Regions:
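Intrinsically disordered, low-complexity boundary segments flanking structured domains
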Residues: 1, 23-25, 43-47
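Short intrinsically disordered terminal tails
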Residues: 1-6, 61-64
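Short aromatic-glycine-(Arg/Gly/Cys) micro-motifs in beta-strand/loop hairpins
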Residues: 3-32
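A short, exposed loop/beta-hairpin motif centered on an aromatic-Gly-Thr core
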Residues: 25-42, 60
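Short, mixed-charge low-complexity intrinsically disordered segments
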Residues: 41-64
Length: 64
């Protein structure tokens, strides 16, 4: 049986250190279970642009 990996995209907003999604470049925090996530990268960037988060947001892609 072939394994299928699911890619999820999360928006990390620079909020001065509050609710970070990354502990390090390779380690996620417990806040991922509450984070807004997208399955489509285009929709992720569209959400960022629509809500004016261009300068303070970063997209994190996570393979599950």
């Amino acid at each position: 049986m072939e394994e299928v990996s699911v890619t999820r995209h999360y928006i990390a907003v620079n909020a001065g250190g509050w609710y970070p999604l990354l502990k390090t470049a390779q380690d996620y925090t417990e806040y991922f279970h509450e984070a807004l996530s997208f399955s489509d990268l285009y929709e992720t960037y569209r959400y960022i642009e629509k809500h004016g988060l261009d300068k303070i947001a970063t997209v994190i892609t996570r393979m599950l």
